[in-house]
Amino acid sequence: GFRAFLRWEMEREYTEEKRKALFSRGGLYYELKEDYAHALECYTSGGDHSKVSELLVRNAELHPGMGHYAEMEKYYRSLPEAEILASPSLMQGMSMLCALAMDYEGSERWYGELQAFAERCGRQDAAGKQARSRLAWLDISLPQRGVNGLTETIPAVFRLLMNKEVTLPSFSVTSALPSIM
């Protein structure tokens, strides 16, 4: 309808630069209203990968493990790899996304990238602590890991928490529905 007409008119009348600016303003409008799905759509249409990345991280912190991965998958997958590799939160998201799509090889690849990121950071480095926290989260929640190692993993993570070496984001990959956890 009318929306399609407006898009057609925009394509006809606006330069590429003006279109990007319009999508950026639209993204900001939705972001301020905390409508991240529409904001992500606008920022993606405008080609603003850094804003997409920033919003995915913010959304992951607002709704950690509450099933947002499936809803946000196309945005995660649209990001350049370098952007994902710079963020522990995005690497964690990619690892879980791949696992939920039963791409366990991809999931373990992103887990490995996150592990390498954590190893490059110092013990007192905030980014390193965040990466180690996200690794602990993945150790507990990745579905391909099964329940066999959990009897060792959970006490080890508990010790890290008590020593304040990690802080765990909350999680429920089943959208807070009952699960094996």
Task: Identify what each model region corresponds to.
Residues 33, 46, 66, 101, ...:
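Structural motif corresponding to the intra-repeat A-B loop/turn of tetratricopeptide repeats
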Residues 36, 40-83, 87-95:
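Short, well-ordered secondary-structure microsegments
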Residues 82-181:
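Internal alpha-solenoid helical repeat scaffolds
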Residues 25, 45-46, 58, 71-78, ...:
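The canonical alpha-helical register within tetratricopeptide repeats
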Residues 1-26, 49-50:
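Short capping/hinge segments at domain boundaries that bridge a core fold to an adjacent linker or tail
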Residues 7, 20-31, 56-58, 92:
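Alpha-helical tetratricopeptide repeat
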Residues 16-46:
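Leucine-rich, amphipathic alpha-helical/linker segments
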Residues 16, 20, 36, 49, ...:
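TPR-repeat structural position
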